[in-house]
Amino acid sequence: MQFSRTQETAADQAAVTLLEANKISARGLLSFLRKFEDQDLLSPNRQDPYTRSHPLTIARIEFVTNHIETSEFSQNSASVRDLEAHARLRAKLVGFLQPVEQILRLYPVENQSIPARYARAIGYYRESDISSALREIDGLIAEQSGDPYFHELRGQFLFEGGKLEEAWPSYELANKLLPEDTLLMCELARLEIEIGGNQLINKAVTSLERVVVHEP
């Protein structure tokens, strides 16, 4: 998909507006854009795929630079919470997008941080090593039992591994921890329909009716 310069300008404007509203510096955005600055000089077959589909112009870098010069939040540092969330998001992307060999190079088993175990759990699951995936995710749940996304991921491992009844408690708990999340409602409803039985199907219908109310 090709993105026009107009689309990229609109995206940049939306990005800095969102950052400003949350009192976050745009220095990270500028650093990201500069990583691709030299890509324009390369032949198309040597360019990063992102650069080929997302035009990078001097104007984009100048726009973000000007914003940084005028924003009162440009010297703000990322909070510990934001850094932790970023590390976890990066681990999730690596887990779902990279080969397991690359995952284990980036997050070796000696690394027992939450992002590392998260990435390995997803990587093992993609390799159909459900027992290793469950070992990693169960360890995370033992430490952070109130995290709905860990329970959701555990449910996904079991559901897609054909263990529908075993998956249900994990999805049910994820929904209880995050009751207004319509995506979780849909996932739970799908599982309940797959399992079958009047009670679960009726429950699934109720959940889907709530989804329609939230997102008509």
Model region roles, listed by residue range:
Residues 1-2, 198:
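Glycine- and small hydrophobic-rich membrane-insertion segments that are intrinsically disordered
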Residues 209-216:
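Short, intrinsically disordered, charge-balanced linker/junction segments flanking boundaries
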Residues 2-183, 191, 206-207:
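Extracytoplasmic and endomembrane cell-envelope/extracellular-matrix remodeling and assembly machinery
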Residues 184, 199-200:
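Short, structured loop/turn "capping" segments at alpha-beta junctions
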Residues 127, 197-199:
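Short coil/turn and helix-start
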